[in-house]
C-alpha cells in the first residue's frame, strides 16, 4: 500500500532543484507530511496553485523512502487568495501555519485536533469578522492547549489555588498566586488576562469588545508563552502586523 | 567516499542548488577527464563573477559598473518603474521587449516564515527613488505565487499615499509559479494587460 489519500492544509513550501517543490502538509488522518510536488514551479503545472501555503487540499500521495510524492491534488478551499490581499491577515496566517508545524513537529503521527483547529482558524481569518491578531492569539492559545500546554489563567499554575491572581510567569505556566510567584513574574492588567481567558474559551463577544491596549498586552503575553514552550520559537511572529 | 581532492570537489558541487550527490559525482568525473585549458576557463569564469560583478547602486540589478546597463541607458522611460524580486526576473521581462521603463530589484520577496520582512528587502531604496518625483507608474511584477502576491499587497499599501498609478501584471500568469519560467508570449501579454490596483 504505497498510495494513500488524505485531506490537508499546505503549511510551507521549499524549492527543490530546478522546478520541484517540497510541501509540508498538516493532514486530517496522517498528521504532518512532507512531500515533493514535481514540476510545480513550471508555469504550465496545474499543481502549482494547489500546492501553495494556506490551501486546503484533497491529495493523493505515493509513499517514498524519504519523501512522499504528490500524485494528485484538488483544491477544497484556497484561503491564501483571500488572505494575500490583506497584509495583517496574511502575516497572522503565516504565523498560524508556522506554529502548526512546530507544535505538531513529529511527522506522520496523527494530530486530528490540531488539523481541525488550524482549519477553523484559517476559515475565521479568511471570513474577516474579527481582528486578525485576536484570531491568531486564540489559535496560538488553543493550539498550545491541545498540545498539553494550556496556560493556567484562573488558578495558580504552581499550587492550583483558585484566583483571581495578579501575576503571570511564563516559565511557571501562567498566572501565579502571591505565595508561589517566582522571580521574573509580570503584572498584566486584569483586562488582558480576561481577554486571554475569552480567547481560550472562544468567547468572541467579549474578545471583540476588548480595548486596543489590552489586545496589545495579551498578544505580548501569548507570544512570550508560545516562544517559551516551542523549542525553536516561531520566526514569523515578529513580522505580524496589526490591522 | 573518494580520496581527498575528488571528494572535496564532489562535496562543493553538491552544495550548489539543484545538484544532488549523483550529479555532483558526474560533474566531478567530467572535470577530471576534461582538458586542463577547459577547466581553467571555468575557474576564471567563477573567479571573475565574484570579483567583477556587483549590484547596481540604483536598481539592485546585476552590474559590472556602479550602475547596470539598463540604468545607464538614456533611451529608457524614467516615468515607469517595474518592481521585481530577482535579477533573473529582469532578464525574463527584457526578453518580452514589452517594457521600456526602469527596474527596481527587491532582492527577494517578503517571507515571514523565512524571517524575511520588508526591512530585509530594497524597499527603502524604492521609496527613495519614488520620492524624487519623476515616476508616475509602478508596475508590481513580483512572482505569481503567494509570497510574490503578499509582497505586492504590502508595496501597494505603502505606495498608496504617494498618489502614483500602481499596477500588477495581469493574471493569465499561472499562479504558484516563478516569473522566470513564464514564456515570453505569456509574460508579454501579462504586461500589456496589467491592471491598476486600488487598495
Ligand atoms: Zn500558588
Ligand atoms: Zn540598475
Curated annotation (Swiss-Prot), chain A:
<comment type="similarity">
    <text>Belongs to the RecO family.</text>
</comment>
<dbReference type="InterPro" id="IPR037278">
    <property type="entry name" value="ARFGAP/RecO"/>
</dbReference>
<dbReference type="GO" id="GO:0006310">
    <property type="term" value="P:DNA recombination"/>
</dbReference>
<dbReference type="InterPro" id="IPR012340">
    <property type="entry name" value="NA-bd_OB-fold"/>
</dbReference>
<dbReference type="GO" id="GO:0006302">
    <property type="term" value="P:double-strand break repair"/>
</dbReference>
<dbReference type="GO" id="GO:0043590">
    <property type="term" value="C:bacterial nucleoid"/>
</dbReference>
<dbReference type="InterPro" id="IPR022572">
    <property type="entry name" value="DNA_rep/recomb_RecO_N"/>
</dbReference>
<dbReference type="Pfam" id="PF02565">
    <property type="entry name" value="RecO_C"/>
</dbReference>
<comment type="function">
    <text>Involved in DNA repair and RecF pathway recombination.</text>
</comment>
<dbReference type="InterPro" id="IPR003717">
    <property type="entry name" value="RecO"/>
</dbReference>
<keyword id="KW-0234">DNA repair</keyword>
<keyword id="KW-0227">DNA damage</keyword>
<dbReference type="Pfam" id="PF11967">
    <property type="entry name" value="RecO_N"/>
</dbReference>
<keyword id="KW-0233">DNA recombination</keyword>
<protein>
    <recommendedName>
        <fullName>DNA repair protein RecO</fullName>
    </recommendedName>
</protein>
<dbReference type="InterPro" id="IPR042242">
    <property type="entry name" value="RecO_C"/>
</dbReference>
From Swiss-Prot, chain B:
<dbReference type="InterPro" id="IPR006171">
    <property type="entry name" value="TOPRIM_dom"/>
</dbReference>
<dbReference type="InterPro" id="IPR015967">
    <property type="entry name" value="Rcmb_RecR_Znf"/>
</dbReference>
<dbReference type="GO" id="GO:0006281">
    <property type="term" value="P:DNA repair"/>
</dbReference>
<comment type="similarity">
    <text>Belongs to the RecR family.</text>
</comment>
<dbReference type="Pfam" id="PF02132">
    <property type="entry name" value="RecR_ZnF"/>
</dbReference>
<dbReference type="GO" id="GO:0006310">
    <property type="term" value="P:DNA recombination"/>
</dbReference>
<dbReference type="InterPro" id="IPR023627">
    <property type="entry name" value="Rcmb_RecR"/>
</dbReference>
<dbReference type="Pfam" id="PF21175">
    <property type="entry name" value="RecR_C"/>
</dbReference>
<protein>
    <recommendedName>
        <fullName>Recombination protein RecR</fullName>
    </recommendedName>
</protein>
<feature type="domain" description="Toprim">
    <location>
        <begin position="79"/>
        <end position="174"/>
    </location>
</feature>
<dbReference type="InterPro" id="IPR034137">
    <property type="entry name" value="TOPRIM_RecR"/>
</dbReference>
<keyword id="KW-0227">DNA damage</keyword>
<keyword id="KW-0863">Zinc-finger</keyword>
<dbReference type="Pfam" id="PF13662">
    <property type="entry name" value="Toprim_4"/>
</dbReference>
<feature type="zinc finger region" description="C4-type">
    <location>
        <begin position="56"/>
        <end position="71"/>
    </location>
</feature>
<dbReference type="InterPro" id="IPR000093">
    <property type="entry name" value="DNA_Rcmb_RecR"/>
</dbReference>
<keyword id="KW-0233">DNA recombination</keyword>
<comment type="function">
    <text>May play a role in DNA repair. It seems to be involved in an RecBC-independent recombinational process of DNA repair. It may act with RecF and RecO.</text>
</comment>
<dbReference type="Pfam" id="PF21176">
    <property type="entry name" value="RecR_HhH"/>
</dbReference>
<keyword id="KW-0234">DNA repair</keyword>
<keyword id="KW-0479">Metal-binding</keyword>
<dbReference type="GO" id="GO:0008270">
    <property type="term" value="F:zinc ion binding"/>
</dbReference>
Amino acid at each position: 500500500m504505497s498510495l494513500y489519500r488524505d485531506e490537508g492544509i499546505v503549511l510551507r513550501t521549499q524549492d527543490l532543484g530546478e522546478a520541484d517543490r517540497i510541501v509540508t502538509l498538516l493532514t486530517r488522518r496522517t498528521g504532518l507530511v512532507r512531500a515533493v510536488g514535481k514540476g510545480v514551479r513550471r508555469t504550465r503545472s496545474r499543481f502549482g496553485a494547489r500546492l501553495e501555503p494556506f490551501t486546503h487540499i484533497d491529495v493523493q500521495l505515493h509513499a517514498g523512502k524519504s519523501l512522499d510524492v504528490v500524485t494528485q491534488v484538488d483544491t477544497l478551499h484556497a484561503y491564501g487568495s483571500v488572505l494575500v490581499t490583506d497584509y495583517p491577515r496574511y502575516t497572522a496566517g503565516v504565523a498560524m501555519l508556522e506554529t502548526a508545524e512546530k507544535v505538531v513537529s513529529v511527522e506522520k503521527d496523527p494530530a486530528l485536533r490540531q488539523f481541525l483547529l488550524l482549519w477553523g482558524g484559517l476559515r475565521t481569518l479568511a471570513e474577516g469578522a474579527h481582528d486578525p491578531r485576536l484570531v491568531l492569539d486564540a489559535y496560538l492559545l488553543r493550539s498550545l492547549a491541545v498540545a498539553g500546554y494550556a496556560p493556567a489563567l484562573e488558578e495558580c499554575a504552581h499550587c492550583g489555588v483558585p484566583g483571581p491572581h495578579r501575576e503571570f510567569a511564563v516559565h511557571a505556566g501562567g498566572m501565579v498566586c502571591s505565595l508561589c510567584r517566582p522571580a521574573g513574574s509580570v503584572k498584566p492588567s486584569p483586562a488582558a488576562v480576561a481577554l486571554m481567558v475569552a480567547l481560550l474559551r472562544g468567547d468572541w463577544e467579549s474578545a471583540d469588545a476588548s480595548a486596543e491596549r489590552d489586545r496589545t498586552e495579551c498578544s505580548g503575553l501569548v507570544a512570550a508563552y508560545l516562544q517559551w514552550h516551542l523549542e525553536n520559537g516561531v520566526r514569523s511572529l515578529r513580522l505580524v502586523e496589526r490591522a | 567516499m573518494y580520496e581527498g581532492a575528488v571528494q572535496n570537489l564532489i562535496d562543493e558541487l553538491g552544495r550548489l542548488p539543484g545538484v544532488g550527490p549523483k550529479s555532483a559525482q558526474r560533474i566531478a568525473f567530467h572535470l577530471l577527464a576534461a582538458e586542463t585549458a577547459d577547466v581553467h576557463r571555468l575557474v576564471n569564469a567563477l573567479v571573475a563573477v565574484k570579483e567583477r560583478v556587483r549590484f547596481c547602486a540604483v536598481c539592485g540589478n546585476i552590474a559590472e559598473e556602479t550602475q547596470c546597463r539598463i540604468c545607464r541607458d538614456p533611451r529608457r522611460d524614467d516615468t515607469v518603474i517595474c518592481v521585481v524580486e530577482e535579477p533573473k526576473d529582469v532578464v525574463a521581462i527584457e526578453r518580452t521587449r514589452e517594457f521600456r521603463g526602469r527596474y527596481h530589484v527587491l532582492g527577494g520577496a517578503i517571507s515571514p516564515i523565512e524571517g524575511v520582512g520588508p526591512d530585509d528587502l530594497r524597499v527603502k531604496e524604492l521609496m527613495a527613488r519614488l520620492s524624487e518625483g519623476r515616476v508616475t507608474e509602478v508596475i508590481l511584477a513580483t512572482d505569481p505565487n503567494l509570497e510574490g502576491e503578499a509582497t505586492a499587497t504590502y508595496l501597494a499599501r505603502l505606495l498608496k499615499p504617494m498618489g502614483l498609478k500602481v499596477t500588477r501584471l495581469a493574471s493569465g500568469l499561472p499562479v504558484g509559479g516563478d516569473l522566470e519560467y513564464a514564456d515570453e508570449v505569456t509574460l508579454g501579454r501579462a504586461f500589456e494587460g496589467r491592471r491598476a490596483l486600488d487598495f
